[in-house]
Amino acid sequence: MKGREAYPDEELRRRIMDFIMAAGQALLENGAEVFRVEQTMEIMARSFHLREFHVYVLTNGIFASAGTAEISEVRNV
């Protein structure tokens, strides 16, 4: 199927999720606004074709999921 983007498999989604969470954590630790962290993480998820990405950022933590309960992560910052 030319032109169609494949949805990443579960292992790849986990690796992508770790990458996006690390980026969000780095932004938050270096003083980025909460809105900017959420927005950046959502843009990154779209660029990796994660369809069901949800993120909630506080000043001291990040909560995110990528479609399933198995691919959910919380990070304290």
Predicted regions and their residues:
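Soluble N-terminal domains of membrane-associated systems
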Residues: 1-77
